[in-house]
A protein has these predicted regions:
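PLP-dependent amino-acid enzyme catalytic core
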Residues: 1-161
Length: 161
């Protein structure tokens, strides 16, 4: 279950490896929409994406035994960079994911799902902590959706705050 305490814990943890990206006011989008629009440039993270937040927090929640087994994931790109060294497999995500599950089972690796994991979503949701810290009266947060982990984390934390 995603709780405010978990988000606060994750927020402190991901500070070890992430930048607190500052909101940038967009004149163009504000003019186009008639609203004040701010952008959160997570592309400034050292991996080029927010995914390191979820991956790092998830790894921090693993036991020493789980980490010692080795970690494996499947990714369309950015989540894998957040986890570790990458070996590309397959032509599409589903092929990579199937292979990752196969190797996790065969080798005993700990599989870290890129979005279907509460700890990953919690880590990704730390973005909302930073948004509300900088802009406490935010009315709307528009979140891009791929697998849904970022949307899960951000929307859950927004409701909790």
């Amino acid at each position: 279950m995603l709780t405010l305490d978990k988000f606060e814990e994750a927020s402190e943890k991901v500070k070890e490896v992430t930048l607190e990206t500052k909101l940038i006011y967009s004149d163009f989008l504000s003019d186009q929409t008639g609203n004040k629009v701010y952008l959160k440039p997570e592309n400034m993270q050292f991996t080029g994406a927010y995914k390191v937040r979820g991956a790092y927090y998830k790894i921090s929640t693993l036991t020493d035994e789980e980490r010692a087994k080795g970690l494996i994931t499947a990714s369309a790109g950015n989540h894998a960079q957040g986890v570790a060294y990458v070996v590309l497999y397959g032509d599409v995500y589903d092929e990579a994911c199937a292979k990752a599950y196969e190797l996790a089972e065969k080798e005993g690796y700990t599989f870290i799902h890129p979005f279907d994991d509460l700890a990953v979503a919690t880590g990704q949701g730390t973005i909302a902590m930073e948004i509300f810290k900088e802009l406490p009266l935010v009315e709307y947060i528009l979140v891009p959706i791929g697998g849904g982990g970022l949307a899960t984390g951000v929307s859950t934390l927004a409701k909790l705050l």
